[in-house]
Amino acid sequence: NSPQQLAQLERAFQLQQANALMVQGVRLADPGRLDVRGVLQCDADVEIDVNCIFEGKVHLGEGVRVGPNCVIANAHIAAGAVIHAFTHIDGEKLGVTVGEGALIGPFARLRPGAQLGAEVHIGNFVEVKNSTLAKGAKANHLAYLGDATVGERVNYGAGSITANYDGANKHRTVIESDVHVGSNCVLIAPVTIGAGGTVGGGSTISKSTEPGALSVARGKQVSIANWKRPQKTPKP
């Protein structure tokens, strides 16, 4: 067979799978723009937008919405979850679980071992790897959670990361329930942030904190009055 014939056969096979899903009640924005490269199981009232790819074993629970241009592999997406556009979910060997009513993306990345509870929010340009997030935890912008255990109702600020690798071994970060982590924080594992605590924006935390404590670890601000900026040297 020529590459052209193989491509035509693949398109016919994919359309066959799309039609079978629609017979089951799945709503596809365009059956001609769907790729199922494994086993896709859909419960009632599922919607899938265009240009989505499903690999390995994927289960979409009742009422799940998948936005355009998503890639989902080896994952269980529970009822009522919404996967916004351009989200990449790769369960590989460890799998990925997204809880009921969770909101993921757009432009989010869930890597192997990501286990998200009900009503978790993972926003744009957030990466989660080998981490557990309990009900209602939120990381909405530009963040990294690797090898972490995150409690209920945690708010994880924009630009914050868990520093989980010391150059030789991976270490775990524990963020207990009701913690607020400010923007641009670094949590150097192994470390535990106590329940109800607050981490001030811009802090680098290398020691565990007590429950309910405010933890701030950053350089003192210095403001120099009447500062004159360097001037460009004229080109010869």
Feature locations, PLM:
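Residue-level signal for inorganic ion chemistry
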Residues: 2, 48, 154
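A short linear-motif detector with a strong N-terminal bias
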Residues: 5-7, 13-15, 26-27, 32-33, ...
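Terminal amphipathic alpha-helical/low-complexity segments used for targeting or macromolecular assembly
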Residues: 1-33, 37-40, 45, 80, ...
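Phosphate-binding active sites in nucleotide-utilizing proteins
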Residues: 32, 37-82, 87
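Glycine-rich hexapeptide-repeat left-handed beta-helix
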Residues: 74, 80-236
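A signal for specific C-terminal beta-sheet/loop modules enriched in small/flexible residues
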Residues: 14-17, 51, 55-57, 69, ...
